[in-house]
């Protein structure tokens, strides 16, 4: 009975925004029609479960804010009606609400804002997966054991009464023969009840084993490196596991690239590369390793699927010294070196190259884990003026955040943690033009900038650090012809 109680409440824990590692929450900065919004989606602890949604509307006379979970397989037509959000006490422009995520797979939270400027909707992609288990607490286990004992005792009492006193007509004595018969029936019922309990425990263990087999984990990436006199070619094969196969759809380009690959040298995180290997098969990617020094690297590969899911594959790779001049396989590849002993903290300014500098406007309050924050940076030219940037992969800037133990990885944009192409695939699915010649018509912007995107050198990345620790942040911009990378470090409380 104790063993049964110990597993009786093992439950699934989902991760939302599994496109990244160690980041449970989704953060989006954008617009819902004419209204500028920030949306934060916090995952539920179980699936099915309720996700917490926080929406901040920064301008406009707002009358209603509705949130709606849209599952990829059913689309908007099969989604439930929107739920009204409620204002946060003491914050006129902040709203809170909860949504049920009922299944594993690709969701989007549709945020509809209505007011004096009309109505508009923002689409925030969310991935819902079972990725862990929670053990039963000792206190609750003890309570369940006591209640189970009471239930078993009650059932045996009912059996004894049914075979004994209940069969005695009114006024007749309950003699020894009837008592022996009642005891015999109770003795027969006891092992049958024990067998039922054993069968229930065995069934639950089978359910738990089946659940473990289907728990989602980051798909395995198998890297191999081929080295000759002039090339260091990295090939990454993504394993199509049973869990991955259950949610798989073809890979689609995000910002014009089939994969965004990041290399971080460990343990000092003193070398960094943002690469774009080509797709040689459905789940095989390859490209040249640039002029980064030899060492052990942690690789993170961002993929976006045609069903709107984004995911990150990861592994380690040992890179030897280059034997000759290395030519990048993609013109948008970029890399940088930053000695691990150099700590460029918030409030500091670092040289980018080509006469440009980048400053982190973060000398104020300390950064607190699990609290929404704005990472603000300013790019200036040689004259000290705020630089005008060129699009780099469709964005004014990209940022990568990695904890010093590599347990946290996130690829950020000024719009937040979401993949832009994931928003696009949900939007075009609503219009009914999801595919063209059997393939998704997505990422129409490719590497160009979004039409309404600011290209100012004043940059803001919305983010929530998931846990305390030391983090390294790489910020990439393109003020001239080449991509420049700044490196910063921060301690999060």
Language-model regions: role of each:
Residues 6-14:
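Bacterial N-terminal signal peptides
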């Amino acid at each position: 009975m104790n063993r049964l109680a110990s597993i009786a409440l093992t439950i699934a824990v989902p991760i939302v925004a599994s496109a990244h590692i160690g980041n449970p929450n989704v953060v989006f900065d954008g617009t819902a029609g004419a209204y500028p919004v920030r949306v934060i989606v916090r995952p539920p602890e179980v699936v099915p479960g309720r996700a917490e949604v926080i929406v901040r509307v920064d301008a406009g006379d707002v009358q209603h804010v509705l949130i709606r979970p849209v599952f990829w397989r059913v689309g908007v037509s099969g989604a439930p009606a929107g739920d009204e959000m409620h204002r946060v006490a003491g914050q006129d422009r902040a709203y809170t609400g909860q949504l049920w995520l009922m299944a594993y797979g690709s969701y989007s939270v549709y945020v509809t804002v209505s007011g004096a400027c009309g109505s508009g909707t923002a689409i925030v992609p969310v991935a819902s997966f079972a990725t862990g288990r929670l053990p039963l607490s000792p206190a609750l286990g003890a309570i369940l054991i006591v209640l189970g004992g009471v239930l078993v005792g009650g059932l045996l009492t009912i059996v004894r009464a049914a075979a004994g006193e209940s069969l005695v007509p009114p006024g007749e004595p309950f003699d020894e023969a009837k008592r022996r018969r009642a005891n015999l029936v109770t003795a027969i019922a006891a092992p049958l009840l024990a067998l039922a309990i054993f069968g229930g425990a065995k069934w639950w263990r089978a359910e738990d084993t089946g659940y473990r087999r289907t728990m989602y984990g980051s798909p395995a990436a198998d890297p191999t490196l081929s080295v000759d006199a002039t090339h260091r070619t990295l090939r990454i094969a993504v394993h199509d596991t049973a869990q991955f196969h259950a949610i798989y759809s073809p890979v689609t380009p995000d910002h014009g690239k089939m994969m965004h690959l990041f290399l971080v040298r460990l343990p000092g995180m003193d070398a960094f590369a943002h690469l774009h290997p080509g797709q040689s098969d459905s789940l095989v990617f390859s490209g040249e390793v640039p002029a980064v020094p030899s060492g052990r690297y942690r690789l993170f590969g961002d993929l976006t699927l045609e069903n709107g899911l984004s995911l990150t594959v990861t592994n380690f790779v040992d890179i030897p010294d280059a034997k000759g001049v290395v030519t990048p396989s993609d013109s948008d590849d970029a890399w940088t070196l930053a000695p691990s002993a150099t700590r460029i903290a918030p409030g500091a300014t670092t040289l980018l190259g080509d006469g440009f500098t980048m400053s982190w406007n973060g000398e104020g309050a300390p950064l607190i884990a699990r609290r929404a924050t704005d990472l603000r940076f300013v790019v200036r030219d040689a004259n000290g003026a705020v630089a005008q940037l060129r699009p780099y992969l469709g964005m004014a800037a990209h940022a990568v955040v990695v904890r010093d133990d590599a347990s946290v990885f996130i690829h950020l944009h000024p719009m937040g943690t979401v993949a832009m192409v994931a928003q696009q695939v949900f939007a075009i699915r609503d219009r009914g033009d999801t595919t063209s010649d059997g393939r998704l018509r997505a990422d129409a912007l490719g590497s160009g900038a979004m039409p309404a995107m600011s290209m100012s050198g004043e940059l803001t990345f919305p983010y929530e650090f998931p846990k305390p620790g030391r983090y390294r942040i790489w910020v990439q911009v393109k003020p001239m012809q080449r991509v420049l990378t700044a490196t910063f470090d921060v301690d999060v409380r």
